[in-house]
Amino acid sequence: MSDDLTRVEKPWGYELHWAKTDRYVGKVIHINAGHALSLQYHNKKDETIMLWSGKLLFEIQQEGELQKHEVKPGERFHVTPGTVHRMTAIEDCDVVEVSTPELDDVVRLEDRYGRSDAKK
């Protein structure tokens, strides 16, 4: 495991990768207020997120429908492969994510920053 923190700049904020092995990854996702990650799913990546600070709107596919949850610090969600989801910051927020190591496994369905083939 690397001892270095890796900061990855994103159009919506940044990620701090604090652990990375061949079996898991740990990161803090900082989302600036009013910004959102893409509406996405993963083919293999399995992740659990927990809101550490701020206020977050979390959309997740449940029973075939996209459900919206206003999340408070300490609340968490398990996102299994194939589950459509998106995080939008109501306030500046920090999300702790622990996942399997497939960091490039992102299928974007909508993206306000024009990344990939996603709709804006």
Predicted regions and their residues:
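Short, surface-exposed secondary-structure edge patches
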Residues: 28, 48, 67-69
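Short acidic-glycine-tyrosine-enriched beta hairpin
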Residues: 62-82
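Double-stranded beta-helix
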Residues: 3-10, 88-120
